[in-house]
Amino acid sequence: MEQKELDFFLEENLHTGRIHPSKSPMAAPVFFIKKKDGSLQLVQDYRVLNFMTVKNKYPLLLISELVLQLRGAKYFTKLDVCWDFNNVHIKPGDEWKVAFQTNRGLFEPLVMFFEMTNSPATFQTMMNNIFRDLIAEGIMVVYLDDILIFTRTEEEHAKAIRQVLQVL
């Protein structure tokens, strides 16, 4: 079962250009975890690399701040962005640093994987920059790959949803 999942992961990510073969002098091991639905998920074990990495301290939204922003809102829409971390490219030339080793060979990701310590902060920064104007208008908040649109009236809500979807 694990071999089948590994082969699927490698084939899909090689095909989509998210990874390529590597000759890196270092590599992280991989293992599988069982997800809630019983399926397996491949995990790159970047604990050693993450320990040595300078941490990006970009703040994530605090729940207490979110509650304050939602005051008075009556209409809510939650969107889940399906292109999250795996669409943020790693700086060219740095790919070798995050190589991972499998029984099928050594590979380098060309995009961020969730297990990299700065992935959440980097993705949050990107999302906040993309939606800067709409966040400033007070009609939405972003928490990683979750978007919450909130307004006081139905008319405002329809307009806000259109604005967010145009940006996406």
Regions found by a protein language model. Give the residues of each.
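Retroelement reverse transcriptase polymerase core
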Residues: M1-L168
